[in-house]
């Protein structure tokens, strides 16, 4: 990390599956883990941004909101609630003839997820995102209701099953100009 900062002028790092860096046992995460503290307390790294993807694949790996002050975290609760508000609520309302969940859950996320991040850390600890390198792309979110991970050898076991997506009437690729237009509009929204 020091080499990247001092020699390459890197100003920040995103740590993939970052909760593994704070593991003290197979199922326990410690936000004060010596490795995390060493990164935080290194004077040559003091001015860098530290962004954690606050989960890993192990038991007890989901740690959104639990990193120490000085870390920012990807906020998957924001991602999921925005996707619900943007796409899933519409889909649910159409299919179930019921009112969508509404704006309440969306508002708490948009306002900084105070129920996830402590007051000491505040809303700037949250890195809000809708799509990333894992899971559905934005195009997938408006084109598929379910994942189709068959061709990669995992028989569909990989990836999340709850993508909170809405295909706008046709699953996957289509040449229907009406479906394509509404998908493009949804992406712009």
Put a short name on every predicted segment.
Residues 1-24:
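Active-site groove signature of glycoside hydrolases
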Residues 25, 30-189:
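Conserved alpha/beta catalytic core and glycan-binding cleft of carbohydrate-active enzymes
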């Amino acid at each position: 990390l020091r080499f990247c900062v001092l020699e390459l002028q890197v100003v920040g790092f995103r740590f993939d599956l970052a909760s593994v860096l704070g593991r003290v046992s197979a199922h326990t995460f410690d936000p004060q883990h010596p490795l995390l503290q060493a990164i935080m307390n290194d004077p040559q790294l003091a001015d860098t941004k530290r962004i954690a993807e606050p989960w890993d694949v192990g038991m007890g790996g989901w740690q959104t909101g639990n990193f120490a002050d000085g870390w920012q975290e990807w906020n998957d609760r924001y991602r999921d609630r925005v996707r619900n508000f943007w796409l899933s609520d519409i889909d649910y309302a159409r299919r179930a003839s019921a009112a969508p969940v509404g704006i309440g859950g969306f508002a708490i996320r948009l306002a900084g997820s105070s129920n996830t991040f402590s007051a000491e850390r505040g809303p700037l600890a949250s890195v809000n995102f809708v799509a990333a390198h894992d899971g559905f792309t934005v195009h997938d979110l408006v084109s598929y209701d379910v994942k189709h991970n068959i061709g990669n050898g995992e028989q569909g076991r990989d990836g999340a099953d709850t993508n909170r997506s809405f295909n706008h009437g046709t699953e996957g690729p289509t040449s229907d100009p009406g479906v394509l237009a509404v998908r493009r509009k949804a992406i712009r929204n």
